[in-house]
A protein has these predicted regions:
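Intrinsically disordered, low-complexity terminal regions
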Residues: 2-277
Length: 277
């Protein structure tokens, strides 16, 4: 294909991509539903570790605020309520102080807004002590999700609905999802695995600043694809009909199958890999 000309072609392979970020792979390996003992064993440092549980009823919107230090793992189920587990980890100068801090930490689930409240965590407070909370949720499969995290990954599996998923330091993993989805991470990879012949919903848009993106697509998918890797290549092992101006190996616009909902993927410092699931 002559660069800079308008063209239609089906691509199977493009430029090699930069390494897709490891945080997304670690996300995928994360096991859901560990016992308290097993889950607490994963904590790097803890003087006190507890798992708190609550059930939330009559809510379709699930809003998880994990903007302390902890990740969020969500999976769909067939029940109408939301089951919440929060792993609370505390460290301090003494066991007595750690237990006191743990007693002040509360799991809040009011009106579908889920968070953990606890002692102030300013710079002086953090000097010799600290606490964090990670979440696991089972939600109805048609839930609307809003998730915010700072230091931790976000995983969503088997949910179909509107989603806004954001983290700063952590990977983003989506498996068997659909709907109207926006996902973003600053420092972490993005790993998406789709099922079905078409995306059930308006669009999917994901982006990362420092990390790569992997899209694993089912064989008979129909969608419109836009991919952009600013400082990395795009590696395609999937039939894509490319249209329009072909001027860069770092940008791709095309049609998969018969076309349909739009899939957008953007990486600033990292590559994009598009493969068959």
């Amino acid at each position: 294909i002559e660069m800079g000309r308008t063209a239609w072609t089906t691509l199977l392979v493009l430029a090699p991509a930069a390494t897709v970020g490891l945080p997304a792979q670690r996300n995928r390996d994360r096991v859901f539903g560990l016992s308290q003992e097993e889950w607490c064993r994963e904590a790097r440092r803890s003087d006190v570790c507890e798992v708190r549980e609550e059930t939330v009823s009559n809510t379709r919107m699930v809003d998880v605020d994990a903007r302390g230090n902890g990740g969020v793992h969500i999976r769909g189920w067939d029940r109408p309520d939301v089951h919440v587990r929060a792993r609370v980890v505390v460290y301090a100068d003494s066991d007595t102080e750690a237990k006191q801090i743990a007693s002040e930490i509360k799991l809040v689930t009011t009106g579908g807004r889920i968070r953990v409240d606890g002692p102030s965590r300013d710079r002086n407070w953090w000097r010799d002590r600290g606490w964090s909370a990670s979440f696991e949720l089972e939600v109805p499969r048609n839930s609307e999700l809003m998730v915010g995290a700072t230091n931790g990954g976000v995983i969503v599996r088997d949910v179909r609905g509107r989603m806004d998923l954001r983290t700063v330091n952590g990977g983003l993993t989506l498996d068997d999802v659909s709907g109207d989805i926006r996902g973003e991470t600053t420092n972490g990879g993005v790993d998406i695995r789709m099922t079905g012949d078409k995306w059930e919903g308006p669009s999917l848009e994901v982006r990362t600043v420092n990390g790569g993106i992997t899209l694993a697509l089912p064989p008979n998918l129909s969608a419109e694809l836009e991919a952009r890797a600013v400082n990395g290549g795009i590696h395609v092992r999937y039939p894509v009909t490319v249209r329009g101006l072909i001027s860069s190996r770092r940008e791709l616009r095309g049609t998969i199958g018969n076309g349909g909902p739009r899939i957008r993927a953007s990486a600033t410092n990292g590559g994009i890999s598009i493969t068959r699931r």
